[in-house]
Amino acid sequence: MAKEIKFSEDARQSMLRGVDQLANAVKVTIGPKGRNVVLDKEYGAPLITNDGVTIAKEIELEDPYENMGAKLVQEVANKTNEIAGDGTTTATVLAQAMIQEGLKNVTSGANPVGLRKGIDKAVTEAVKSLHEQSQKVENKNEIAQVGAISAADEEIGQYISEAMDKVGNDGVISIEESNGFNTELEVVEGMQFDRGYQSPYMVTDSEKMEADLERPYILVTDKKISSFQDILPLLEQIVQSNRPILIIADEVEGDALTNIVLNRMRGTFTAVAVKAPGFGDRRKSMLEDIAILTGAQFITDDLGYDLKDATVDMLGTANKVEVTKDNTTIVNGDGDKNSIDARVTQLKSQIEETNSDFDREKLQERLAKLTGGVAVIKVGAASETELKERKLRIEDALNSTRAAVGEGIVAGGGTALVNVYKQVSEIEAEGDVETGINIVLKALEAPVRQIAENAGLEGSIIVEKLKHAEPGIGYNAATDEWVNMLDAGIVDPTKVTRSALQNAASVAAMFLTTEAVVAKLPEENNDAGGPAMGGMSGMM
């Protein structure tokens, strides 16, 4: 496969065209008066959304060099989404601004390495300033404000606030599709731990890459399962009941794992294996918690139990189990209420008695998992298209709210980024490093500028007025007013704003220091090649 290489200015300009195409499609969605983007789907109705990362993921460009540029900015959106769960459009706008301004300076002869140093210095100072501005989220009302701003819907903010109030800030909140028109909040008891399936072939929903088990049996053991023969007698009993099984063990490997996957693919039975949560003695305690919650007998050498002798009666059960790549959630375990209450009392006593902050924290986590619930926001809408769009907005709002609880909030609407301008501009530097700092300074204005332009205003006028306003005072594009953003409830999670800036700067610096780009040459179509072979004319 032949490949083509482009160098320096030619390479960067080709990639810039891709950056601009993706960023221009994404940035029309930013702000309260941002527009939607319609995405063509291979199956089903088109998706209408204003979610930056969803739009970015759909963009594939024909030119390989332009596509590489688009993929770089796509990475900014993906990374920001992974870390903060929101702010992907802001990150895209910042990345485009830094790349465009940086490229002008590289073309004028600036050293990309010097620019990178300046960008890094400026971002470090900006993040420091953001943390200084940050305020803690202290009540239910503030949580609702964060959710409402992210989703551009006060009702969604209220649902998220109520859900977090019922299951705690660290509780499990899942988002499901409702069969009706209305969105509802439902709280069900459940336990979640950070271990996922041991093989992707165990999933029951290949689109979401998760395994949903209805009324499963649950095997709880601290043993390592290597031989399929050890669990075969138990699985034979389960096959007759036609119910799925969740296997929680120290590890399922070798012959056992292979046969579980093969039988799952053949449709013989549905089994999902996950590693036991925790480590050392804490692992054993957490397995005991799961056994009590589900009504299982904990199969361990300490109690003299052997896997080969296990029966269905020793298994726990639950109403539902959801397993993803990273997490397992057990909903409505069928454990004895008195046993669960006794375990809760025991944990509370241990929390009071321990002198270790670390142990206390871990005990509180276990208590929360044993007593806490799973809040389910059931999303309703009049059409499938609206349902998908609304679900995406709620997911973003939930992520944004969690981020706010973790690191606090700053003034929204891009105001916080402009508020760090003064502190960043005071960094002492010279030459290309100073130019790198100026690249970031100009980029800090970009989100506010774009929000204003999406509202039909001249962005530069709003930016200049904001630079001279008191810190915290910003432009409310929804009402066309200048207000105290925090008092008005127009806030952004510090984590979202910080992540967007850091990820945008990282990709911009990589872009500017790129000197060569390698891409495959398009294959020539030789179907209409030579003449037909003698004596075979007319044959296909």
Swiss-Prot record:
Q: Which InterPro entries match?
A: Cpn60/GroEL (IPR001844), Cpn60/GroEL/TCP-1 (IPR002423), GroEL-like_apical_dom_sf (IPR027409), GROEL-like_equatorial_sf (IPR027413), TCP-1-like_intermed_sf (IPR027410)
Task: Name the enzyme group at the top EC level.
Answer: isomerase
Q: Name one GO molecular function term.
A: ATP-dependent protein folding chaperone
The chemistry this enzyme catalyses reads: ATP + H2O + a folded polypeptide = ADP + phosphate + an unfolded polypeptide
Show the stretches that span the lipid bilayer.
none
Keywords assigned by UniProt, alphabetized? ATP-binding, Chaperone, Cytoplasm, Isomerase, Nucleotide-binding
Q: Which GO terms describe its cellular component?
A: cytoplasm
Binding positions for ATP per the UniProt entry: 29-32, 86-90, 413, 476-478, 492
Where is this protein localized, as stated in its record? Cytoplasm
Summary of the function given for this chain in its UniProt record: Together with its co-chaperonin GroES, plays an essential role in assisting protein folding. The GroEL-GroES system forms a nano-cage that allows encapsulation of the non-native substrate proteins and provides a physical environment optimized to promote and accelerate protein folding.
| The protein's assembly and partners | Forms a cylinder of 14 subunits composed of two heptameric rings stacked back-to-back. Interacts with the co-chaperonin GroES.
Family note: Belongs to the chaperonin (HSP60) family.
Which HAMAP family does this UniProt record tie to the protein?
CH60
**Designated name of the protein:** Chaperonin GroEL
Q: Which gene encodes it?
A: groEL
